[in-house]
Design a protein with these regions (language model features):
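A transmembrane helix-and-boundary motif of multi-pass membrane transporters/channels
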Residues: 1-83
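Short, functional N-terminal and low-complexity linear motifs
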Residues: 31-35, 89-92, 115-120
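Alpha-helical rod/repeat scaffolding segments in eukaryotic adaptors/tethers
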Residues: 46-53, 74-83, 104-112, 136-143, ...
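Oxyanion-binding "anion nests"
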Residues: 87-105, 120-123
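Conserved amphipathic alpha-helical segments that form helical-bundle/coiled-coil interaction surfaces
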Residues: 83-96, 175-182
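General secondary-structure edge motif
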Residues: 5-9, 40, 47, 95, ...
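Soluble C-terminal extramembrane regulatory/interaction domains of multi-pass membrane proteins
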Residues: 59, 63-67, 111-222
Length: 222
């Protein structure tokens, strides 16, 4: 490092004089200056990061709309292919933003890191939900309510959307579910339990986004 070179030169000189100090300081400043300039002008990966963000949000949208279809149709066949594809995209995106963060001294990439980590956490929730979707064989009235929520969530995935209204709507739906008549058959009971779990998972999914938005609201406004 420049500081190591400076100390080594002073030790080898066996003396300290103003001309020597001035010369070594000039060497230090030149070396540090070139390093900073190289860092500032190093190519940014911003365009690639933005492209990954678009891919991630589009893939999330496809998954949520697929869930909506399964709930409306009462068809639980789901191999989670889209979720696996999204996991691959997220791994690639995170590798890029980690690299971008290490390569830029003044380039702020914490926002991007936390954004893709938030989406990764959401995808893990979707993976659990996909398994529960497979158990929803009954096209119950509650299924249609939840399907509508999946559709609305798919429409509000943008990083700029705070998603507060979705959380409130889920709370309302939970209250509605509690007031409905008790299931009459074992199948209805199991489906109701699965639907409630899906609703709670969806609430967690959305709250991850709400928390992220609250933490980075100033970044979005700047």
């Amino acid at each position: 490092t420049p500081s190591t070179v400076l100390v080594t030169h002073l030790l080898l000189a066996h003396s300290v004089s103003w001309p020597l100090l001035a010369n070594e300081m000039a060497v230090f400043l030149i070396g540090t200056g070139f390093a900073l300039l190289a860092n500032l002008y190093m190519a940014s990966n911003q365009q690639d990061i933005d492209n990954y963000r678009i891919q991630v949000e589009e893939q999330l949208r496809k998954i949520l709309l697929r869930f909506e279809y399964f709930l409306k149709a009462g068809d639980g066949r789901n191999d989670a292919t889209l979720i696996k594809e999204l996991d691959t995209i997220l791994q690639e995106a995170l590798a890029l933003v980690y690299l971008d963060h290490s390569n830029h001294l003044f380039h702020q990439t914490n926002y991007h890191i936390h954004y893709f980590e938030m989406r990764q956490a959401q995808n893990r929730i979707l993976e659990d939900m996909a398994g529960n979707i497979n158990n929803c064989q009954l096209a119950a009235s509650e299924s249609l309510i939840l399907a509508r929520l999946f559709s609305k969530t798919a429409q509000q995935l943008s990083q700029e959307n705070p998603a507060h209204e979705l959380v409130e709507e889920i709370e309302t739906c939970l209250a509605v579910f509690r007031e409905r008549p008790l299931p009459k058959t074992r199948q209805e009971f199991e489906t109701r339990a699965t639907l409630l779990q899906l609703l709670r998972d969806l609430e967690t999914f959305i709250k991850l986004k709400v928390e992220f938005y609250q933490n980075y609201q100033k970044v979005q406004a700047s």
